[in-house]
Amino acid sequence: MRLVLLGPPGAGKGTQAAILSEKLRIPHISTGDLFRANIGEGTPLGKEAKSYIDAGKLVPTDVTARMVKARLQKDDAEVGFLLDGFPRTVEQAEILKEMLKGFGVELNGVINYEVAEDVVVERMLARGRADDNEDTIRTRLQVYRDETAPLIRHYGDDIITIKAEGSIEDINARTLGALGK
């Protein structure tokens, strides 16, 4: 199964991805993890990404896409994957589509975890991270909405919307049910 995971910060994508990865026996591929791994290993792509991150800039789409492509070419991703953090834009969605076409496959679906803003704020404040204050969280949510709304429209009928409120187990059951698992 080849899936993209969407949802605002604090929606529980990482938590659900870990459970789904184990249950579906497919890798969870997070762009954040890819950046950290490539930078940590000192790969050419990692060095390129680090130069942008160190300058406080976003890593360009082409660098991120090359990291994703390299990761998708590994053996464990042949049977499927959960992609988290890419695509973030319609342009990236088109790049992913072409990339997968080159592998002779396509996405099986796009899971969009929906959660009320107040629930996200509450969850993120409860994590106790230094950079998580209410104003910062609400700003991040607005940026997410602005970036992702066109992507959700782009995927249209391929979107599988999951209400990401309630227990971790309930959310996982809803996700697996929507996937027919």
Curated annotation (Swiss-Prot):
The signal peptide stretch is none
Region (LID) residue spans: 126-132
Sites binding AMP sit at T31, R36, K57, L58, V59, G85, F86, P87, R88, Q92, R129, R140
**In which compartments does the protein localize?**
Cytoplasm
Alphabetically sorted, this entry's keywords are: ATP-binding, Cytoplasm, Kinase, Nucleotide biosynthesis, Nucleotide-binding, Transferase
Pathway this chain belongs to:
Purine metabolism; AMP biosynthesis via salvage pathway; AMP from ADP: step 1/1
**EC number(s) from the headed UniProt entry:** 2.7.4.3
Give me the ranges of the annotated region NMP.
30-59
Q: Does the keyword rRNA-binding apply?
A: no
Function of the protein: Catalyzes the reversible transfer of the terminal phosphate group between ATP and AMP. Plays an important role in cellular energy homeostasis and in adenine nucleotide metabolism.
Record protein name field: Adenylate kinase
Source organism of the structure = Corynebacterium diphtheriae (strain ATCC 700971 / NCTC 13129 / Biotype gravis)
Taxonomic lineage is:
Bacteria, Bacillati, Actinomycetota, Actinomycetes, Mycobacteriales
* Originating gene: adk
